[in-house]
A protein has these predicted regions:
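PRPP-associated nucleotide enzymes
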Residues: 1-144
Length: 144
């Protein structure tokens, strides 16, 4: 599957209300609410992402008989840049609850000029991502 970008901000949705709270200076002071709103964003993202993933048909036995239903062809790998991405990661996991996880610890290493830096990776824990859908959850929030 090629890399794709879906701009969820093109149309008003529940995401708009959640982002309004995240950007609100007063509400930002409530750390628990801020983290929960990031988690809500992850849940909304997961739902939207699920619409473009590949599915296969599977038979399930219901109380009324057999039914053919679409299920994900393969679970994604949810990758997070530690720490800021953790609430967003959890929101995605709330929906992709059988997904594999990948965690990366990285920081900007500045040398000399403040405008130039290298990304230093200190830690990486990940399953093989070869041929897999990887969802990178890194909020990189700019709330000003």
């Amino acid at each position: 599957m090629p890399a794709t970008v879906h701009n969820l901000g093109l149309r008003p949705s529940l995401l708009s209300a959640v982002l309004a709270e995240i950007r609100d200076r007063e509400l930002q002071q409530d750390r628990m609410r801020f983290r929960r709103n990031l988690e809500r964003c992850g849940e909304i993202f997961a739902y939207e992402i699920s619409k473009v993933l590949p599915y296969v048909e599977r038979d399930v036995q219901t109380s009324l008989g057999a039914a053919r239903v679409p299920v994900l062809a393969e679970q994604p790998v949810i990758a997070s840049i530690l720490r800021a991405g953790l609430p967003l990661h959890q929101g995605l996991l709330n929906y992709f609850d059988h997904a594999d996880n990948s965690f990366i610890s990285a920081y900007r290493k500045h040398e000399g000029d403040a405008d130039h830096f290298e990304v230093e990776i200190e830690y990486l824990s990940s399953p093989s991502v070869e041929g897999r859908t990887v969802i990178l959850c890194d909020p990189m929030l700019a709330t000003g």
